[in-house]
């Protein structure tokens, strides 16, 4: 009987020793936004609470400044 081993989650920001998450770093932010435009929760990504709060604020700022979309492209 084969056992399924779940990969260990780790905080990417802690591993890379990031001090603050920048709202202008769109490549990083896009990795934490789902296909539908929702912010992916930390229980799925493994991000620590401190960085999850910074991430949410940065994504919301980028959305407000029209750097990121609020939703998906609606089937375009």
UniProtKB/Swiss-Prot annotation:
Q: Which InterPro entries match?
A: Ribosomal_bS18 (IPR001648), Ribosomal_bS18_CS (IPR018275), Ribosomal_bS18_sf (IPR036870)
| One GO-annotated biological process of the protein | translation
Keywords of the record, alphabetical order, are:
Ribonucleoprotein, Ribosomal protein, RNA-binding, rRNA-binding
Has keyword rRNA-binding?
A: yes
Give one GO term, molecular function aspect: structural constituent of ribosome
Transmembrane region positions? none
One GO cellular component this record assigns the protein to is: cytosolic small ribosomal subunit
- Could you confirm whether the keyword Ribosomal protein appears in this record? yes
The record's listing under NCBIfam families reads: S18
Q: What does this protein do?
A: Binds as a heterodimer with protein bS6 to the central domain of the 16S rRNA, where it helps stabilize the platform of the 30S subunit.
Q: Say which family it is in.
A: Belongs to the bacterial ribosomal protein bS18 family.
Subunit details = Part of the 30S ribosomal subunit. Forms a tight heterodimer with protein bS6.
Q: What is this protein called?
A: Small ribosomal subunit protein bS18
Species the sequence originates in: Pseudomonas putida (strain ATCC 47054 / DSM 6125 / CFBP 8728 / NCIMB 11950 / KT2440)
């Amino acid at each position: 009987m084969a056992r399924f081993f779940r990969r260990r989650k780790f905080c990417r920001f802690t591993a890379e020793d990031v001090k603050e998450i920048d709202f202008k770093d769109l490549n990083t932010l896009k990795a934490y936004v789902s296909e539908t435009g929702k912010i992916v929760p930390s229980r799925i990504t493994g991000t620590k609470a401190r960085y999850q709060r910074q991430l949410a604020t940065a994504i919301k700022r980028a959305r407000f400044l029209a750097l990121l979309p609020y939703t998906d492209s609606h089937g375009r």
